[in-house]
């Protein structure tokens, strides 16, 4: 892709998200979503092949349907209340439809089917944008309407997402699909706490984006897309492979790594609100995610796949690509937990 064209497209993607996050008028929010969707499709099709075309088509159809539901919710709200303001409370029916539209855009269960398929059909840089940046706009809308969301609907979507995110990743060997199912589970955790403490949702989103960005950048650096190729990186880059495995365990929520902090805070917040059954179910289902990350760690670090003696010596040679930019990301992705007492200052 021409660098100038790519710059224009990326600018449009960012502008679309910024319009959604800052607009106070529902029509402008819808325009921002459409700008973002139409600009991100060429990024998904950057490596032109049948799989990326199929993935882009699935993404377009899902997002277009969600945008249509958004406009339906806005129109119904206009009929009920006669106003277009994002900051004013939505009517109950409009709020339910809007929640479903945003769930479809985020890939929450039961609207999650497109996420693993699209993530698998595109390149790693495109997958990074899909699973991080593309979550910002829908989450900003959910944050703004959090006071009027139907709590039962939200909890149902959340529990389903955490469960499906765990079950779906169990039999996967493709790392992009594993990251997609992990994304579904993380979105479930974020939406659970949305009605109780919306600010905590934003903190959770920031940590999720940090962990996912670090993991994808390390995959790109090592050109890794499957569990088999991940096991071979141990011979070439042992330090980077160790960092990948630690970041993945952090994504799974294993203490004392950074990924444990948002889960801990969400469970604490739910129990403060006299909710015991829900966090117990969430904690049990989070073990499914942790299990497939632990299995990945085991197969990579504690077992050696068949390889020649020449392959085992590759770590001795200098690696051409620079890894300087990864150092702060890896540190943040694994060592935020000791800083968590400072978050008490935010309350």
Curated annotation (Swiss-Prot):
Compartment(s): Mitochondrion inner membrane
Topology of the protein relative to the lipid bilayer: Multi-pass membrane protein
Any GO MF annotation of the entry: NADH dehydrogenase (ubiquinone) activity
Tree of life domain: Eukaryota
Pfam families (alphabetical): NADH_dehy_S2_C, Proton_antipo_M
GO BP: any one term: mitochondrial electron transport, NADH to ubiquinone
Enzyme class per UniProt: translocase
UniProt keywords, alphabetically: Electron transport, Membrane, Mitochondrion, Mitochondrion inner membrane, NAD, Respiratory chain, Translocase, Transmembrane, Transmembrane helix, Transport, Ubiquinone
Enzyme Commission no: 7.1.1.2
Reactions catalysed: a ubiquinone + NADH + 5 H(+)(in) = a ubiquinol + NAD(+) + 4 H(+)(out)
Gene Ontology cellular-component terms listed: mitochondrial inner membrane
Family affiliation: Belongs to the complex I subunit 2 family.
Subunit structure: Core subunit of respiratory chain NADH dehydrogenase (Complex I) which is composed of 45 different subunits. Interacts with TMEM242.
Protein name from the UniProt record: NADH-ubiquinone oxidoreductase chain 2
Origin species: Pteropus pumilus (Little golden-mantled flying fox)
